[in-house]
Amino acid sequence: TASSAVRRLAGGAIMGSSTAWFLTENPDFNGSVLVIERDPTYECAATTLSNSCIRQQFSTALNVRVSQFGADFVKNLRTYLGGDERVPALGIRNFGYLYLADSDAFAQTLRDNQRVQLAAGAATELLTPDQIKARYPYYNVDDLILGSINTRDEGYFDGSTMFEWWRRQARERGVEYVTGEVVALTSNPAGTRVESVTLASGEVIACGQLVNAAGTRGAQVAAMAGIALPIEPRKRY
């Protein structure tokens, strides 16, 4: 069968559901949204397995500001979601990430990055080995030159709850979720736009636009459109 809508999202975990939510939140958007998710239990999704960590120690101002918006969204989730009293209050468990330099080159990178971060409004501190030892006496700092840490809006949060409420509100606003695995994409003759997706069931779904929100499988979906996307799943320890 074939059907038509404005937006199709391949992947329904936190990236797909947040995209669907933000589309429906935009007053200029009057289309329809369909989310295609291969596993509606999300048992093995990166969203489910993630520690939901957030940081601001980046080398570009844009990344810092994106993270700051994310932190504000977490801390004011109920407000962003329209004051819905069902939405719980969330916060960030601040502990900060400590980056350690054992070479002059990496120490200079930390200094350069701190300038970018401070200019963007982050609270990054640079620590000498003695300062690191004073804060963390159990560390051996003999081979260290410099440390970098930010303990404001840097730590972890309850990402599962945020995901659940993005998804719940998206569905309440008319976003449709279907179970299926995208196995092929069909592009227009010029190869500039995806016109339809084919599911493992054989169903063909027409697209106005397709959003690749497949997470660690994003490279596989992109390859169906002839795009080499440098995404690969890696286990974090």
List each language-model region with its residue ranges.
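Gly/Ala-rich phosphate-binding loop of Rossmann-like dinucleotide-binding domains
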Residues: 20, 24-25, 169
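Beta1/beta-strand and adjacent pyrophosphate-binding region of the FAD-binding site
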Residues: 2-15, 34
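A short, glycine/Asx- and small/polar-enriched loop/turn
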Residues: 105, 136-145, 187-196
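Dinucleotide-binding Rossmann-like beta1-alpha1 core, especially the glycine-rich loop
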Residues: 51-135
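Glycine-rich beta-alpha-beta "Rossmann" dinucleotide-binding loop(s) and their flanking helix/strand
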Residues: 220-237
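Glycine-rich FAD pyrophosphate-binding loop
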Residues: 24-47
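Helical element adjacent to the flavin cofactor pocket in flavoenzyme catalytic cores
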Residues: 149-209, 213, 217-220
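Conserved Rossmann-like nucleotide-cofactor binding loop
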Residues: 15, 19, 41, 217
